[in-house]
Amino acid sequence: MVPTQVTIFSIIMYVLESLVIIVQSCTTVAVLFREWMHFQRLSPVETILISLGISHFCLQWTSMLYNFGTYSRPVLLFWKVSVVWEFMNILTFWLTSWLAVLYCVKVSSFTHPIFLWLRMKILKLVLWLILGALIASCLSIIPSVVKYHIQMELVTLDNLPKNNSLILRLQQFEWYFSNPLKMIGFGIPFFVFLASIILLTVSLVQHWVQMKHYSSSNSSLKAQFTVLKSLATFFTFFTSYFLTIVISFIGTVFDKKSWFWVCEAVIYGLVCIHFTSLMMSNPALKKALKLQFWSPEPS
């Protein structure tokens, strides 16, 4: 059982984190839209980032609506909101994975024909990657839609005995069909992300070793080391976010109801830090953040 003070603190942290994520999302979309209006084009990375900004904005509002709405109304009335939340979450996973793929293709020094072809075609492939993420997210939420329909059926069958064969079959269908497919829906984009990060790290380490061997300048080595540190931060927070989501879905390691707000505060704290690291990787967004939070006082 979680102390009341911890729950209240977690709720406050969750609200603050939600506000920060919403501001981050709006800033990302506004800055990159301004860049597009000015230059009439966006790079592949910026296209993914603006899509991530929109998905994070929708994800956070959906999360707040569901979390606070279920206090006043039964959870089943908000099943549609929870399905939208899951859709936006999986979409965010896919977009982050595609961002890792873009970084891998753009930065890595591999000369395999596949990498060379991707570097040439990546600008045309970005919109297809985003469309693929949308389609994959739609397919991934089908088990959840079925699950909530089953739960609503179970509510209507409350007058039947608990060991009724129909109820047991519906419960088994929910457990053996919905939960594993939900894990697959989150797992596939995460493993795409993982493979891209591993390949990029291997490439950067190889290049860093070569630069040290040929006595490159300290500034070049420092730049490579900075990229590796940024990559480690990117990997750490996204992996932590994925593991926290998985644990919250399983809900068997701890009392899910009493730890709910603690989990929410941890999950969206990780989202907030991870999104900040993504913004700092883009020069235009980094400049906007500095102007917003570290601008000098007018004389």
Curated annotation (Swiss-Prot):
Q: Which GO terms describe its cellular component?
A: endoplasmic reticulum; external side of plasma membrane; trans-Golgi network
Output one GO BP term.
Answer: detection of chemical stimulus involved in sensory perception of bitter taste
State which ranges are Cytoplasmic (membrane side).
27-47, 104-125, 205-233, 280-299
Q: Which UniProt keywords apply?
A: Cell membrane, G-protein coupled receptor, Glycoprotein, Membrane, Receptor, Sensory transduction, Taste, Transducer, Transmembrane, Transmembrane helix
Q: What is its main location?
A: membrane
* Note, other: Several bitter taste receptors are expressed in a single taste receptor cell.
Q: What is this protein called?
A: Taste receptor type 2 member 16
Source species:
Mus musculus (Mouse)
State which gene encodes it: Tas2r16
